[in-house]
Amino acid sequence: MRTSQAIFILIFLDSVRNQSPQVIPAKWDVVYEKETGHNMSLTVFRFQVKEQYSVARIIMSCNESTEHNPLLAVFREKLAILSLQVPLIVDNYEYSQVARTLCPFTEYKEGEAFTVEVTSSRPVHYNFRAELVQNFYLYNNSQRLVTASASEPVYLRYDIPGDVDSVAVHLDSNSTICMTVSVQKIGCPVFDLPDNVNSMGLHQTMTTSATIPVEKSRMSSFYVVFVVNTNDDLCSEILSIKPNKPTKFPLRMKSFNVTIESSMKIFDYTIPIVFWACILLLVTIVVFVYHYFDGIWERRFVSRAYTHLEDNAQEQRIRDFYDFQRMSEDDDLKDYDLLTDCQDMMVVRAKASLTVADLSMTPYEERELKYDVYKIALAIIGIFYNITVLQLIISKAGSLRQSGDLDECTFNFQCARPLWYFVAFNNVVSNGGYVYFGTLIIVMNYCRERSFRRLFAVQPTLAERYGLPQHSGLMTAIGLAVIMEGISSATYHVCPNNINYQFDTALMYVIGMLGKLKIWSLRHPDMVVSAYHAFGFLGVFLMAAIAGVYVHNMIFWALFSIIYIASMLLVSLEFYFKGIWTLNLRELRNSIRLSWVSSRHLSCVVPAYKARFFVILLLNIANTAVVVYGLEAHPKDFLSFLLIPFIGNLFIYIIYYILMKMIYREKIPKRAIALLFAAVISWTCAGILFNQRVSDWSKMPAISRELNKPCIFLNFYDNHDLWHLSSAFAIFFSFTAINVIDDDLMFVMRNTIRVF
């Protein structure tokens, strides 16, 4: 627009070349009230440049000029020709007062003239004033109050000191008027109009807060440009009604404070990173020391347990011998009708009181293969998933660096620590905890598996009749999922927005699903869900979750509610009846009729498994409440909305499992109690930090930046970074506790361990 406007003006000037212009020796800071001449005659204002590198600002106003008879002004400088038109019309918003800051007089010598040429097609009255900009330079940690309007953009200059690697340009305002802030390399012309301010450098929209991190390697000196937008469409989800034709509007003024602060040097990044690495190293030392002493305890324990098991086996053989002899003497086996299907699944699971032995009748090797499929399938999914994610995010990072449009990503810009291609390197590196603890879960699970194999080699009876069946596949899959969560979360934080939000959220769903399956498998080893069915269901679930991000009509919510409640009902039936129910309506009707006829005092209404019924009722009430809330509120952040019940159900299941152990008077190992206590503390801290949001991709970028907050730890980590760290600890403590919570049952007969 600027180039075409200048060409248009030059054509006008060429048409009046033969006319004698009116030349006015002008003075700075003087208001000239003039009228343009007839026949496109020129009025030339000549200003003496008193000082090199000084900066001029022109203010013009005219109430008589129109779209078809504009007041035109051309500023002739040595490096460029700039133009100005009154009224200024942008998207049919018309402003009769216009101001522009010109390029610094870098090539002028003292006494040379700077000219402003004014003309119009018909005579109009106008006011004109030229002034030298005072305090054109910005300085470190010095706050500057600036005022700009839609037709009066402002820009200031800043030079990064030699001992500074990067700076943060911070703005705050009490006004919510939408404005665009741009950081541009030193040059002429400066792009300071609403239609071209986004064409150069780094830029972002602003309501009450904005922060732009600038690296010295990218721009050692730059202009900070402030352009107030004609409306709030770029900052608000509610679009304004634009005029159909040019309409005069009053000036949209916005006052704000500008502060430039030095960011951390690259060398200073090592302190918070090394600090975090030392914490992880300390955890590693504690884990290995624990395993060392645990190995000593294991050898002593196995020695005592071996004698105990031999004594029990001898006593059992004696009891079996006398029982068989007594039966032989009293009756003949031929007198009894033998139940040939006593080992049938339907018969066993219909018992009033199930034991783990009833649900672990499948050969160990066959079960182990099913559990191993989880880690194999997840590893394959992870490879293809993360390759695609990495490819997309690398492309996105390059696009962000080229376009400079910081509205593409919802960072916490007040605590963004740039490095290499990362705008907020701290958000990326803080995800290392997931990768570390996921790896640690796998290593500890492998050591545990080896320990059990050594134990079972010494005493094979343990693997067949005692304790809970030990399968490592699911826990290894959980470790892989946590590693993938760290990688996906790191890639998401390269440029967080609504397009790639599902990168790490999808892995949170995987962790939640595997956690529930792990707890279920502890006492239901034969009822393992096929990995293909589990991941297939999760895939459909994720498709619905992604659809919910973009579709918000009532039809979608109605379908979602029906499917969600139906899924909860099916899971509830499976949990309550342990897989021996059917959807055959005739059998269901006959069963209800038989129960009603055979019951006394409505005893058929009383659930046979009260504890199961209670937890199912609690879960269904909680999940129904979530669905009702969704129908009422239609939350835009649908992925997080679904994640809450998904993880909440896991927590309720863990609490239920612990309470049932206490009800059946099963001891909880001290280490499991310690781990659970640490998990509760970690989850509490994580929950508090998560709710203290520092950005929100579901909101407009300018609105999201209103949530931005400074770093709160080591001048490097913000609330969300600490959420990453604390939730990584919480996940590790939680799943490690689940893995050892039943170690007290290692030498308890399997046919005496209750299923719940």
UniProtKB/Swiss-Prot annotation:
InterPro entries to which the protein is assigned, alphabetical: SID1_TM_fam
Ranges per topology, Extracellular: 19-268, 395-421, 495-498, 552-554, 634-637, 693-728
Secretion signal, residue range per the UniProt entry: 1-18
Keyword entries, A-Z: Cell membrane, Glycoprotein, Lipid-binding, Membrane, Signal, Steroid-binding, Transmembrane, Transmembrane helix
Tissues where this protein is expressed: Highly expressed along the intestine with expression also detected in the pharynx, especially at the terminal bulb, and in the excretory gland cells.
Residues linked to a glycan: N39, N63, N140, N174, N257
Recorded GO MF terms: cholesterol binding; double-stranded RNA binding; RNA transmembrane transporter activity
Bilayer-spanning residue ranges: 269-289, 374-394, 422-442, 474-494, 499-517, 531-551, 555-575, 613-633, 638-658, 672-692, 729-749
Consequence of gene disruption: Hypersensitivity to cholesterol availability and decreased cholesterol uptake. When grown in low cholesterol conditions, 72% reduction in offspring number compared to 25% reduction in wild-type worms, 60% reduction in oocyte number, altered oocyte distribution in 47% of mutants, and 5-fold increase in embryonic lethality. In addition, in low cholesterol conditions, growth of mutants ceases by day 3, resulting in a 63% reduction in adult size at day 5, there is a 22% reduction in the number of L1 larvae that reach adulthood and a 4-5 hour delay in the L4-to-adult transition.
Span(s) of short sequence motif Cholesterol-binding sequence motif: 124-129, 570-578
Protein function: Cholesterol-binding protein which is involved in dietary cholesterol uptake from the environment. Does not play a role in double-stranded RNA transport in contrast to other SID1 family members.
Protein name per its UniProtKB record: Cholesterol uptake protein 1
Taxonomic classification: Eukaryota, Metazoa, Ecdysozoa, Nematoda, Chromadorea
Gene giving rise to this polypeptide: chup-1
